[in-house]
């Protein structure tokens, strides 16, 4: 399990349910028939982890299970691109879910293709650099600002270089009155 995910789960505690879309994290943490996850974990489609987590959160509310944390942990491809609509809906509906984006700035699992998280002028296999190209022609999408624009109560950026800060931000996100976003 990657260090960042260990830190997030350590902060969230054992009473946590995680939904993760297809992507680098899912491929490396669940080689059939095994799993690295030590909490209830749901593998969703690439585009709908936020919708799956929304259903989990509604079911927990229905059964008055307010002590269970619901997380989505997804990469930048599912967050910035393919699952963007479901995330927007989750934010808009106010589900009490912490969405953690594991941002490596490209579709790494399938060959380092550009995503909306890839920085301006960065080299990827689909945005090469050279005489005819400076690399990625688009600026990186500002997902934190988009979350703020949705009125998300808790939005933060973090780095595994600062583990104490990451843990603190996860704990704060779990006490938010509504959705939270950490990148």
Task: Show which residues each predicted segment covers.
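Glycine-rich ThDP/TPP pyrophosphate-binding loop and its adjacent helix/strand module
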Residues: 66-70, 81-97, 102-183
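Cofactor-binding active-site loop characterized by glycine-rich and histidine/acidic residues
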Residues: 1-102, 112, 117-122, 136
């Amino acid at each position: 399990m990657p260090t960042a995910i260990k830190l997030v789960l350590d902060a969230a505690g054992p009473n946590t349910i995680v939904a993760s879309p297809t992507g680098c994290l899912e491929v490396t943490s669940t080689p059939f028939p095994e799993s690295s996850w030590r909490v209830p974990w749901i593998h969703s489609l690439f585009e709908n982890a936020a919708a799956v987590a929304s259903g989990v959160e509604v079911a927990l509310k229905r059964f008055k299970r307010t002590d269970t944390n619901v997380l989505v942990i997804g990469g930048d491809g599912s967050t910035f691109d393919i699952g963007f609509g479901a995330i927007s809906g989750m934010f808009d509906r106010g589900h009490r879910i912490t969405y953690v984006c594991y941002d490596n700035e490209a579709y790494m699992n399938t060959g380092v293709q550009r995503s909306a998280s890839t920085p301006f002028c960065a080299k990827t296999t689909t945005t090469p650099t050279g005489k005819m190209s400076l690399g990625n022609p688009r600026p990186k999408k500002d997902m934190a600002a988009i979350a703020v624009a949705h009125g998300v109560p808790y939005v933060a950026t973090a780095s595994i270089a600062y583990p104490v800060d990451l843990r603190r931000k996860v704990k704060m996100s779990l006490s938010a009155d509504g959705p939270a976003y950490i990148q």
